């Protein structure tokens, strides 16, 4: 099976209690009533022979949040291998922008499984700022090590 690659952009800011990160809540019926472990860093798959990780990270942020990626210097947090084997290249950007969820692109899937009914659902259905300790609980478990990389990078 060929390797799968994703690129991500983790926006962060300095809050009253320390660093805060901007995460998106995964959309679709499976995630609708879940909170802890149901949030993600905006990201998307790409072919590294056809696109740059930075271009994809910016595009995916826009698609999943509905706003352009924050401007400012991007910090390369490197590549992280997910439990699925997918390789995620993450960039971080500090921002003072008042980011908020606007809209998300849609995807099509059969729901409930094996029902024969196909519907369109938002890829993400919300976004919020979280302090790092809270973000560790909210974030899907495979992405939590990325928060450690951010914490190390901004010390």
Language-model segments: residues:
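N-terminal strand-loop-strand
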Residues: 1-41, 69, 91
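Short, charged/polar surface micro-motifs in flexible loops or helix N-caps
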Residues: 15-18, 28-31, 47-48, 84, ...
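Residues that scaffold the ATP/ADP-binding catalytic core of kinase and kinase-like folds
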Residues: 33, 49, 138
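Short glycine-enriched loop/turn motifs at secondary-structure junctions
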Residues: 40, 85, 120-123
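The catalytic Nudix box helix
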Residues: 41-77, 91, 131
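Active-site-adjacent beta-strand/loop module that shapes the phosphate/pyrophosphate-binding cleft
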Residues: 79-116, 128, 150
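NUDIX/MutT-family hydrolases
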Residues: 104-146
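C-terminal/domain-terminus segments
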Residues: 143-155
């Amino acid at each position: 099976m060929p390797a799968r690659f994703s690129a991500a952009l983790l926006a962060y800011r300095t809050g009253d209690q320390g660093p805060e990160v901007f995460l998106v809540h995964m959309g679709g019926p499976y995630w609708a009533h879940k909170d802890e472990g149901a949030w993600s860093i905006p990201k998307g798959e790409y072919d590294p022979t056809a696109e740059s990780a930075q271009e994809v990270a910016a595009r995916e942020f826009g698609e999943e949040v509905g706003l352009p990626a924050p401007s400012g210097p991007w910090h390369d947090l490197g590549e992280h291998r997910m439990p699925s084997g997918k390789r995620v290249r993450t960039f971080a950007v500090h921002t003072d922008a008042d980011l908020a969820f606007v809209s998300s692109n849609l995807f099509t899937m059969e729901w409930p499984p094996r029902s024969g009914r196909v519907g369109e659902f938002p890829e993400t259905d919300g976004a919020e700022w979280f302090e790092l300790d809270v973000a560790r609980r909210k974030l899907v478990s495979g992405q939590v090590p990325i928060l450690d990389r951010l914490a190390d990078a901004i010390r």
